[in-house]
Amino acid sequence: ECRYLFGGCSSTSDCCKHLSCRSDWKYCAWDGTFS
């Protein structure tokens, strides 16, 4: 199960599509993509 926006993460693979893991704050943030 993937993590949603602002969900805790250890790597981008933890996050849902279009989200990437912010290594400095350890949460999933939008990666700027739409497709």
Swiss-Prot record:
It is found in: Secreted. GO terms for cellular component: extracellular region. GO terms for molecular function: ion channel inhibitor activity; potassium channel regulator activity; sodium channel regulator activity; toxin activity. GO terms for biological process: envenomation resulting in positive regulation of voltage-gated sodium channel activity in another organism. Disulfide bonds join 2-16, 9-21, 15-28. Gating-modifier toxin that potently inhibits inactivation of the mammalian Nav1.1/SCN1A sodium channel (EC(50)=38 nM). Also moderately inhibits inactivation of Nav1.2/SCN2A (EC(50)=236 nM) and Nav1.3/SCN3A (EC(50)=220 nM) when the channels are expressed in oocytes without the beta-1 auxiliary subunit. Does not inhibit inactivation of Nav1.2/SCN2A when the channel is coexpressed with the beta-1 auxiliary subunit. When tested on Nav1.1/SCN1A channel, it enhances peak current amplitude and potently delays channel inactivation in a dose-dependent manner, leading to a large sustained current. This is Delta-theraphotoxin-Hm1a. It comes from Heteroscodra maculata.
